A protein has these predicted regions:
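Acceptor/aglycone-binding surface of glycosyltransferases and processive sugar-polymer synthases
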Residues: 1-69, 94-104
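Hydrophobic helical membrane-anchoring modules
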Residues: 2, 38-43, 64-136
Length: 136
């Protein structure tokens, strides 16, 4: 992927060839809704996958403030990348351990999205007004 010029690669369940295995429909709907909310801010179809690879230069010096487990959202919004690719993968439910999904995580995710949308709007507003955008 890096050889093809991408600065960021995201493993995605929501591109052709990707998917989920052994998930209840309710979890599929929650995941789809979470990604639908994030897409206007990130442009990425599976912003919640948690599997990503990026060039170091994309995030060096970038101030991140992750709330909960979704640090990828911070990088997708604040990172300095020109091109990204989504690579298909099939997610299966864990065999050992406990899921990180709780209602507290849902609240943290929504708080983080609101914060990142504010960041995006602030950068857009600064560019629209003709000033140089603030550094992250």
């Amino acid at each position: 992927i890096v050889q093809r010029g991408a600065d960021l690669a995201v493993a995605s369940r929501h591109v052709p060839g990707g998917g989920v295995k052994d998930w209840p429909k309710s979890r599929e709907y929650i995941s789809a809704f979470a990604n639908l909310l994030a897409q206007p801010c990130t442009g990425i179809h599976d912003a919640t996958s948690g599997f990503f690879l990026m060039r170091r230069s994309m995030v060096e010096g970038v101030a991140v403030n992750p709330i909960g487990f979704k640090i990828g959202l911070e990088f997708y919004v604040k990172g300095r990348y020109r091109r990204y690719e989504e690579v298909p993968y099939v997610f299966t439910d864990r065999r050992h351990g406990k899921s990180k999904f709780t209602w507290r995580e849902v609240v943290n995710y929504l708080r983080q999205l609101v914060s990142l949308m504010g960041y995006r709007l602030g950068r857009w507003w600064t560019r629209w007004r003709g000033a140089s955008p603030a550094r992250s």
